[in-house]
Structures are given as structure tokens and as C-alpha cells.
Amino acid sequence: MPQSLKILQSLWTMQNLRSGPDATLRQNIGRIADAGFDGIGALWIDRAAARETAAIARGHNLIVEGLALPDSIDALKPALEWGAEFGLHHLNVQPNLRPRDIRTAIATLEGWQQLAAEVDFAVNIETHRGRLTNDLLVTLDLIDAVPDLRLTADLSHYVVGREIELPVSAETDVYMRRVLDHAEAYHGRVASAEQVQLPLDFPHARPWIEQFKTWWRYGFDRWRRRSGPDAELTFLCELGPQPYAIAGPDGRDLTDRWAESLQLREVARECWR
């Protein structure tokens, strides 16, 4: 089979949608499958929940990206064990620690790499605010120290976290592309310098959508060049509920995040072509 882009929908996105009260896990996964997504993104922090989620997804022929939040080397072990037992396409790790000494950060990443070598699915480290990878420049230092570091690229966190403005400076673009050179999976969301999640249909979002498309095209191309002929790249549509989503005076989301997820899927497909 040729290289392919697998587009996933986040179960987190399915919370508090404008379309009505929250559905059950089974209903949400069924809706995602019926809409033609290739898989789901799910929390992977509880054994019983992981088992149930994996079983329902498997029944719909959906792949699963698990999300773990370990705060130490050993804290990653349960998520790996559940992935091996129940089945994962890959595990996404938000490193829930914030050491001031980069040597501690490097040792933790190397420890996780050793554990990841024992399982038959990929393990990626997410670029995320409030985590080990909180700062773009620190993440670049980590890449220097751990050159085979596998990342899940969620660029929205760096755009808003560093208040990156348009037009993006040449220096910042080089930094972002270095992150993309290590991206083995993507989380899809469009941010601006001041907002982590822009409504996709609002006119002021258009320049930022174009910027993210430029980055995603670059990252997809680089991934294709270095990956095997039948490799799979994943793109998770991850439009979070409030406070990520912007609310109106009635307390409801200003936009329909389910419809936006379908729109974002088409953007990802466009960037892949």
C-alpha cells in the first residue's frame, strides 16, 4: 500500500457540542465512523476506559491514538501496557513535568524512548503548553540533545504561547520547520497570536489558516521523504470545548465544532495532495 494520511477525530471535541447534550461513548464513536474518519483520539489514562474505547473503535474499524500524561519515566508504563493489550495505532504523550534543568528533561525523554522500544506501536511526544515541551526554544534544545525524538506537532500551542504574529519572521519559520522535521503525527487546530483556537469560518482566521496550511504542507512533505513506502501519517482534528472554544454571551459555542472538524479534515486532505 502507498503512504497514506489517516484523519482522526478527537473524542474531546465531542464534548458539549452545540448540537445537543453529550452522547454516549458508543454513540460518539459511531458518529465519527459514519462520517468517514479513519480513527479517534482518546484519553489513555484509565485501563477500563481504554479497554472499552478500543473495543468500540475496533468494531467500527477505527484506529486509536491514545493520550497519556506521565509525570515520570515509570508513569508511562501503564499506558504502554494497555496499548499492547488492547491495541493502539500510536501513543501520544503530553509530558506532565516541567523541570528547570534540561538534563532532567533529556533523561526523561531517553527513558521513555527505552520503554517505547519494547512495544510494537509508535510513541510520540506532543508539543503542548504547560508541559515539558511548553517552549519552542526549549523543544529545539531537546531535539538537539535527542536527535531521534518523535513529535506530535500541535503548532497552535507555540503560535499562541509565543505570540507569533503575521507575517511570521524568517527566524521563527526556521524554528517551526525544525519541529516539523521531527513530526510523526499532527494535531489539527488553527491559532493566532492571542487565541489558541480560531473559529474557522470567521474572516479574520483566513490568514492564519493559510499560514498553518503552509506549515502542514511542509511537514507532510518532509514526512513523506523520510518515511517508508507504506507508512501512515495521522492528523487528529482536535477542536476543544470551552475554554478552548470561544463562547457567546449565552454561554454557548460561537461555532459548530463538529462541522468545523469536517472542514478541518478537508484542509488536511488538501495539504496532503
Where are these regions (language model features)?
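N-terminal pre-domain/capping segments
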Residues: 1-84, 266-272
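Hydrophobic faces of well-ordered beta-strands that scaffold small-molecule active sites
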Residues: 3-15, 40-42, 62-68, 91-93, ...
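Flexible glycine/acidic-rich beta-alpha junction loops that bind and position SAM and/or redox cofactors
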Residues: 16, 160-163, 190-204, 231-250
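Generic structural signal for well-ordered alpha-helices
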Residues: 25-30, 50-54, 76-80, 106-113, ...
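Active-site acidic/histidine proton-transfer and metal-coordination neighborhood
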Residues: 60-151, 160
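Acidic/histidine-rich catalytic cores of soluble enzymes
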Residues: 118-203
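A short, acidic, amphipathic alpha-helical segment used as a generic capping/interface helix at domain edges
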Residues: 174, 208-232
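Short, low-complexity, polybasic intrinsically disordered segments
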Residues: 246-273
